[in-house]
């Protein structure tokens, strides 16, 4: 059988782990299995067929660094349609007065358009995998399948403000989606049960749904301890801190990943560590909504797996994970009053291997037999000159626009900054039309 091989040639290769560094190597990928087969220095020629009927395709990485694809571990992809719609407001007012009313008018077509726009932005800026909490999930799944990226998806369940029938319908939808789409797109798509938060889903509903999710080994993802106004009602109503409340509902296990964790007390950090649950840090969104500064150094010291996420484009307002990892490093230093806190390599780890680990997805590392979720970052720019320290540059100076090639599961999604799997012009045009239509319905 003919084998198709991709070889990424001539690049600096980022190696993470205990001793982060850079090596000079070519990376060989089996495009059928989607895995890295070899990392070496052997020269290869472009577009050739060898004696074993092997088709070889090359990507030029000269003057570039090859690194694991970035993982956006918490977002709401279709919220790209609400980018810039409602800014400069605190979280609860923003949600209740602007975002939730707008989302009530979202159509399946709009969610598809917004998700495709988000995926274009993510591929261009080096994200190969993401976690998406939203609705009209069949449209989200279709967009992911066509684009070639990797994701863990779920229906964002909200029961607050609904009668029992509507609440149970939403709850059932969350469970049905998690069961229906797990393993879709040749396993590139995984699922989770995704209650919005501990305050927007009632306790009795959580008890019922979490029990079913656990029976099916479905991970759980939710917003936790994002703002004081989210923490206080739980303390007032249950006389417990949020993560103690969550633990009592069996919502704190090694497969679960929580978004934000801004207002965590020491015992809650210990609970996360003991449970093996992961925390997704969303620094840009937390800054924009004035939610606070998550205690990332303390979480890392406790051994908690920390990933990074952009949150939705309505609260960020972009999906560039290079921005996010820089924000994480700098905000971590401010929060700890320590310039050595959250160093460059640690921030990159959170945006790659940390994200893959939190989501329970492959990726996040470059080694033989690992999945080929890779990006090539072009260092030939004034803002990346001189290259005293490539790892430092990736954390503090690189931008999403520096990404030259993007590969996911051994498939080239972007080559020389041209996306291969999506008609970008059509996506942008459709998203603009859907966004304007949404706003017209709102008015």
UniProtKB/Swiss-Prot annotation:
Enzyme Commission number: 3.5.4.28, 3.5.4.31
Enzyme type, top EC level: hydrolase
Cofactor binding note: Binds 1 zinc ion per subunit.
Chain ranges passing through the membrane: none
Pfam families registered for this protein in UniProt: Amidohydro_1
Gene3D superfamilies: Metal-dependent hydrolases (3.20.20.140), Urease, subunit C, domain 1 (2.30.40.10)
Residues annotated to bind substrate: 103, 196, 226, 311
Domain of life: Archaea
Protein name per its UniProtKB record: 5-methylthioadenosine/S-adenosylhomocysteine deaminase
Organism taxonomic ancestry: Archaea, Methanobacteriati, Methanobacteriota, Stenosarchaea group, Halobacteria
Catalytic reactions of this protein: S-adenosyl-L-homocysteine + H2O + H(+) = S-inosyl-L-homocysteine + NH4(+); S-methyl-5'-thioadenosine + H2O + H(+) = S-methyl-5'-thioinosine + NH4(+)
Keyword Metal-binding attributed: yes
Family: Belongs to the metallo-dependent hydrolases superfamily. MTA/SAH deaminase family.
Sites where the protein binds Zn(2+): 74, 76, 223, 311
Cofactor: Zn(2+)
Species of the source: Haloquadratum walsbyi (strain DSM 16790 / HBSQ001)
């Amino acid at each position: 059988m003919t084998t198709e091989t991709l070889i990424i040639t001539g690049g600096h290769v980022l190696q993470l782990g205990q001793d982060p560094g850079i090596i000079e190597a070519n990376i060989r990928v089996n495009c059928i299995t989607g895995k890295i087969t070899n990392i070496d220095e052997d020269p290869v020629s472009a577009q050739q067929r060898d004696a074993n009927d092997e088709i070889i395709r090359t990507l030029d990485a000269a003057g570039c660094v090859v690194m694991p694809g970035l993982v956006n571990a918490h977002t709401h992809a279709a919220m790209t349609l609400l980018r810039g719609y409602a800014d400069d407001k605190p979280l609860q007012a923003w949600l209740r007065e602007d975002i939730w009313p707008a989302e009530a008018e979202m159509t399946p077509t709009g969610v598809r358009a917004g998700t495709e726009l988000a995926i274009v932005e993510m591929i261009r800026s080096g994200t190969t995998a993401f976690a998406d909490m939203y609705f009209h999930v069949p449209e989200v799944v279709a967009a992911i399948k066509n684009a070639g990226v990797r994701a863990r998806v779920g229906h964002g369940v909200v029961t607050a403000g609904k009668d029992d029938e509507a609440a149970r319908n939403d709850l059932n939808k969350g469970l049905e989606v998690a069961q229906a789409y797990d393993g879709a797109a040749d396993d590139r798509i995984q699922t989770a049960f995704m209650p919005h938060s501990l305050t927007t889903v009632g306790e009795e509903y959580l008890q019922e749904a979490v029990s079913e999710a656990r029976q099916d080994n479905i991970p759980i993802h939710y917003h936790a301890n994002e703002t004081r106004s989210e923490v206080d009602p739980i303390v007032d109503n249950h006389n417990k801190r949020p993560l103690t409340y969550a633990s009592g509902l069996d919502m704190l296990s090694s497969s679960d990943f929580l978004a934000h964790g801004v207002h965590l007390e020491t015992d809650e950090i210990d609970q996360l560590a003991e449970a093996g649950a992961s925390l997704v840090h969303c620094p840009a969104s937390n800054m924009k909504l004035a939610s606070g500064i998550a205690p990332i150094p303390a979480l890392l010291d406790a051994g908690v797996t920390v990933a990074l996420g952009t949150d939705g484009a309505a609260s960020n307002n972009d999906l560039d994970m290079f921005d996010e990892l820089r924000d994480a490093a700098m905000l971590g230093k401010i929060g700890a009053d320590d310039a050595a806190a959250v160093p460059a390599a640690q921030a990159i780890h959170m945006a790659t291997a940390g994200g893959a680990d939190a989501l329970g997805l492959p990726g996040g590392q470059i080694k033989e037999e690992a999945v080929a979720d890779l990006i090539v970052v072009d260092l030939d720019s004034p803002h990346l000159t001189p290259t005293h320290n490539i790892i430092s540059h990736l954390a503090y100076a690189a931008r999403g626009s520096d990404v030259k090639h993007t590969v996911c599961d051994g498939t080239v999604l972007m080559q020389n900054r041209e996306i291969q799997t999506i008609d970008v012009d059509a996506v942008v045009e459709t998203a603009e039309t859907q966004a304007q239509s949404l706003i017209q319905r709102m008015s």
